[in-house]
Amino acid sequence: MSNILDIKILRVSSMIDKKILFEEVILDNLEIAKKAKVINRDIEIKLIPNKIKVIYGVRRGGKTYFLFQIINKHFKDDFIYINFEDERLINIALDELNELLKIALSIKNTKNLFFDEIQSVDNWDKFVRRLNDSGFNIFITGSSSKLLSKEIATSLRGRNLKTEILPLNFKEFLKFKNFNVKKRYSTIEKAELLKYLNEFIKFGGFPEITLIDDENIKKEILKEYLDGIFYRDVVERHSIRNIKEIKVLRNILINLFANEISIKKIANLLKEFNTKISRECIYNYLEYFSDAYLIFLLNNFSYKTKTISYSKLYVIDGMWNFSLSFSKNKGRILENLVFLELRRRGFVENENLFYVKRKNYEVDFLIFGENKELIQVCYELNETNKEREIKAYEKAIKDLKLDNVNLKIITYNDEGFEKITVDDKEHLIEIVPFWKWSLTY
């Protein structure tokens, strides 16, 4: 009898402890959300009733602060915010979610629920669906596009609106620097603008890093981000055991940014580092890295449906700092930045965004939609490379039968216009600096 009583007392005590813990978590999270200093992003979200608002993107890219931006703008004090990466909620079970919400609603009676990184909870989608069916207004975030997509494609199909968050674009970057963007700049303002552009080219647009001045600290934090993405969003998420081998692969991929890759090329490079990974595993690992937003793979355009042997690889902001040839590759970094800006503008790799490579020419980007556009990226133009880029356009227009197409060459700071004639039709090539192109969207 005594043992049964002791067990009951322990259970009651455990329940009380859990209740106190959950209350602390809710109150702490509410305090964080209310006190957060938010610099608004240039991103809009549709607040459609009865739809679950899904916000996804790279770890540390600004998803949480975008939630705070939404709260500040639309909900003020009428919300509950729960960060499921709070260490006190690690391994929380589905039945405990109900208790957590019950306690949260006793503290703040609201219909507006903000769940940060809820994908770490098993069966989170069923919990969220039930709440949505009960009339709650729900916002969720996650760092994995595919894991979110899997649940969204089943339990939450037709019930969600998705918004992708990437690190800051250059316009937002300047806002974080308190630089006033306008149409014309004085000599001093232009010099300051180019100073910030150089910083953006070097480190990219992760929000926290943008607000730090010390370059050594910037690099340290970037390394923490790289490790966080690698260990939490790749190794842990996919239960990978051969960490040493996949880390070698990660480093190889970063060194190959803005380059064409193939499984065969990667396998040969792994051999040079005395590392063996099967081709099937390489393919799977590329998918894991892509899912975690560490890399992006862009396919060579073709009108024919065929097996893709080669892709061009790009990395998320600033990761080029960990390339061995970083200092020599400003052109590749600029190309990588152009790719990321195109992604921010809503173009999706291998759906309406490609590169074009044939035996005798190459074009960095093809936007293949209602309005077609060819884009070359060249850090600094001279007579030799200008002629090469123009000839590539002439060949691409003929080869791909692009009668009506916009043509751009994006540079560091060169600008102007060139005219070409293809099959008796005149085309205008706009040469535009990256900073101007990125600020006029």
Curated annotation (Swiss-Prot):
Database matches in PANTHER family: AAA+ ATPASE DOMAIN-CONTAINING PROTEIN, ATPASE
GO terms for MF: ATP binding
Superkingdom as given in the UniProt entry: Archaea
Tagged with keyword ATP-binding: yes
Organism: Methanocaldococcus jannaschii (strain ATCC 43067 / DSM 2661 / JAL-1 / JCM 10045 / NBRC 100440)
Keyword annotations of the record: ATP-binding, Nucleotide-binding
Residues annotated for ATP binding in this entry: G57, V58, R59, R60, G61, G62, K63, T64
Record SUPFAM superfamilies: P-loop containing nucleoside triphosphate hydrolases
UniProt-recorded name of the protein: Uncharacterized protein MJ1544
